[in-house]
Amino acid sequence: VTGVQTCALPILSALKDIDEIYLHHVLHSLSIAAIANFKPKTEIIDIGCGGGFPGVPLAIFFPDVKFHLVDSIGKKLKVVEAIAEGAGIKNITTQHTRVEEIKNRKFDFAISRAVAPLKELWRWSKPILKKDNNNEMVNGLICLKGGDLHQEIFESGTRPKMMSVYEIFNEDYFKEKFILYVKRS
């Protein structure tokens, strides 16, 4: 057992089988591609990337887009790095830090999946988003969330566009899953 495998075991142990990984993680991540057609050289930060979702599937789908995956837990990043290296994914970089600590870089978009309340995600994202847009969508935060989001959205003070993942992928798992998009103002 290698060091990377040792790191990966606790992260992947909750995933029951390949179908679950594909449906619950890969497809869910790729739902972002249904609403955003990122142009080449777009720079995206994945906040709290965990085991690499949504960043890794999106990096495969958009090979000319630069993805910077950030997490405060180093073990998770080791798994992401091993996956990227093993799959030959060249458009991913990683950083072991909290997003609030990033001061010297700007991105076109921030993405996340099940990381923190929208209010926090927006507070962390807004300072690191570029002002100039290179895509059809205005630069901003795109996050994947589930459940009843009305209170969370209200408390965030933002006015996100909210799209149902179920309308993209007609699977029961996605009935209460949503994509939230907050434009940089």
Task: Please report, for each region that a protein language model flagged, where it lies by residue.
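Conserved SAM-binding loop and adjacent beta-strand
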Residues: A14-A33
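Conserved SAM/SAH cofactor-binding pocket of Class I
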Residues: L30-S112, W122
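Conserved beta-strand signature within the Rossmann-like core of class I S-adenosyl-L-methionine
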Residues: N133-D148
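A short, conserved alpha-helix within the catalytic core of class I
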Residues: L118-P127
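Short, small-residue-biased leader/transition segments that mark boundaries at the very start
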Residues: T2-L9
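Conserved beta-strand segments of alpha/beta enzyme cores
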Residues: K66, N91-T93, G140, K161-S164
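A generic alpha-to-beta junction signature in SAM-dependent methyltransferases
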Residues: A36, L129-N135
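Active-site capping/gating segments
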Residues: D148-S185
